[in-house]
Structures are given as structure tokens and as C-alpha cells.
């Protein structure tokens, strides 16, 4: 199984990008012993369409076109489900045990996700009730993926 963060827009070099890369690298290393074959970042261009609905539809099309057969799609959405780190880890572990080949975590553009992506989602996930900048949402998600790996492996990073 592999994890892919599919994000609309590109993250510039700097402290935020360094922190994102650090958590992705930690997740890669921690996941190897758990059968995770990769933790990838897929940055897609923002739509240039004039209308928000057209931008969302175009961006959703890009995310959906990249899904392989059997993949699970997790969309980050402000109206999504709030989960504890332990529950998030259990969900990932269940999908791994079900031989899901890939989990794609989608972070939409400034206008959010298009209806097609929301309808296809296997899980709509919120990172709490607050709205986060997309760069911080990427970092939070990468950290939670790493944390899930440490929970599954019994590493002391996650303390209750």
C-alpha cells in the first residue's frame, strides 16, 4: 500500500516546505516496516477558470484522473468527519489489511472540492472546526500520517 497526498497548488520552498518534507520522510521510513511502499506528494496546478464551480470541477477532474483502480479517496473538507489520531490510524490500518493498494488524500484548491470528488470520496476528513491555510493543512496531514505509522508500530512518538 502507498499513500499519496494530492494537492492543488504548489508549495514554495521555505520553512513550511521543509517541515512537510520532514514529516513525509518520517512517514516513509516508519511505514516500511508496516508494508507501506511509498508516501508521495502530487502537486497539481490550480485551475485558471473564471467561475469557482468551473475551477472546482476542473481540479476535481485532475484528482480523480490520478486514482488507480481500488484506491481509497480521502478528501479534506471543512464539513468532513473529525477523527482522533488513534481512529485515523485504525482506519488506515483497516484499509491496509483489506489490501487497498493506495490511499489518496486530496487537498482541494482555494474554492474547495468539486462535487464529483466529494461524491467519490471514501472518507471526508476535517482537521478540526477551524479553517487552515492549505500549506498548514498539508503539514498537519503529513504529521498525522506519520503519527498513524508510529501508533501502528508501537513507537513512543504518540503518547496519550
Outline where the language-model segments fall.
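Short, acidic/small-residue loops that bind anionic groups at enzyme active sites
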Residues: 97-106, 126-134
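S-adenosyl-L-methionine/SAH cofactor-binding core of RNA-modifying enzymes
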Residues: 35-103
